[in-house]
UniProtKB/Swiss-Prot annotation:
Pfam families referenced in this protein's UniProt entry, alphabetically: Ribosomal_L18A
Protein name from the UniProt record: Large ribosomal subunit protein eL20
Domain of life: Archaea
HAMAP family: Ribosomal_eL20
GO molecular-function terms, A-Z: large ribosomal subunit rRNA binding; structural constituent of ribosome
Quaternary structure note: Part of the 50S ribosomal subunit. Binds 23S rRNA.
Length: 86
């Protein structure tokens, strides 16, 4: 069974393509099994939240990071959770 890893994804996207196009850079931490799934998550995230087409998202760098290297404390704490009881 594969282990879930953390990926740091850097890139740029074209926001507001139809009205006033603006190219913005982004940095996002993603949990995925491999790089391919991390890239797919980025495309689906920006597509659903901001209505950005895949061809307007340019991924410049993707790198695997360790759990200790994650800058956001909330993400580190969520990564330690084994199960959720509802």
């Amino acid at each position: 069974m594969s282990e879930i890893k953390f990926y740091l994804v850097k890139g740029s996207a074209l926001f507001g393509e139809s009205h006033y196009p603006e190219k913005r850079k982004f940095v996002k931490i993603v949990r995925a099994l491999n790089e391919k799934q991390a890239i797919e998550y980025i495309y689906s995230y920006f597509g659903s939240k901001n209505k950005i087409k895949r061809y307007n998202i340019k991924i410049e760098q993707i790198s695997e990071i360790k759990e200790e290297e994650i800058p956001d404390r909330r993400i580190r704490e969520l990564a330690k959770i084994d199960k959720i009881i509802m």
